[in-house]
Amino acid sequence: MPDHDNWNEHWDRYAAAASQNPAQQMRHALIAKLLQNGSEGRPAQILDIGSGQGDLMVKLRPLLPQAKLLGFELSPSGVKISQEKVPEATFFVADLFQPPAELQAYAGWATDAVCSEVLEHVDSPAAFLRAARPYLADGARLIVTVPGGPMSDFDRHIGHRQHFTRDLISSVLQEAGFKVECVYLSGFPFFNLYRCVVIARGKKLASDVDAGQAGFSAWLANWVMMVFRGLFRLNLMDSRFGWQVVAVARKIG
């Protein structure tokens, strides 16, 4: 397995940095808003496909206290961290192309599903979504986030195969058996600016994260992240310039 596909190593190395990442926090806020707006007062059963280290569940738990939360994640390290963070949720170590027998109990289970920052890491995004499809109820809503805009050296370092456009993610969802309701190009202008910083830093960003920071460097990094967290509140939900792609689709029965 290539290093950039070793998800145990990924979460062991990057778990803390991912939790503090203002871009991840921005995405989770967008997802939470979409889930809340479409809940229609019914108890939700939410499946996080590629649940990582559970940060989305941490965000959703207080906002949707009646919802049942389920996560599928390839990495045992990610599942362990997730279970510690959100003991009320259920997590499985799962390769959807070779699913464990326990997942059979969740066939048609999800009223809502999320697949956030996963599809850029797989060779066939449509095949991956088709493998996840059996765990969604007919008519279930799927929220997908994927990166748009240019790819950085750090993106390649952590295993990005491709970035997406509005048309490309729509095509992937349709091929996987979903009806696309809308695709937003979010994040303009300040997420784009943040991404330009990441692109400029390149592979050195991986060294920064691996080495850790102390003293003035740590203070500066935290200050920059705090500034972007504030600026991200001013981002547009949709414009033709946004580099954060957010799609909402429905499972076709």
Language model features: what each stretch is:
Residues 126-138:
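A short glycine-rich, Lys/Arg-flanked "PGG" loop and its adjoining helix->strand segment in the class I
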Residues 178-189:
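Conserved S-adenosyl-L-methionine
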Residues 155-158, 192-198:
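Short aromatic-enriched loop/helix-cap "lid" or pocket-rim segments at secondary-structure transitions
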Residues 117-121:
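A short His-aromatic
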Residues 1-108, 112, 116, 126-129, ...:
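Conserved N-terminal segment of class I S-adenosyl-L-methionine
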Residues 140-146:
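Conserved beta-strand signature within the Rossmann-like core of class I S-adenosyl-L-methionine
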Residues 19-23, 153-172:
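Acceptor-substrate binding/catalytic loop of class I
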Residues 66, 88, 139, 177-180:
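A generic structural signal for alpha->beta connector loops
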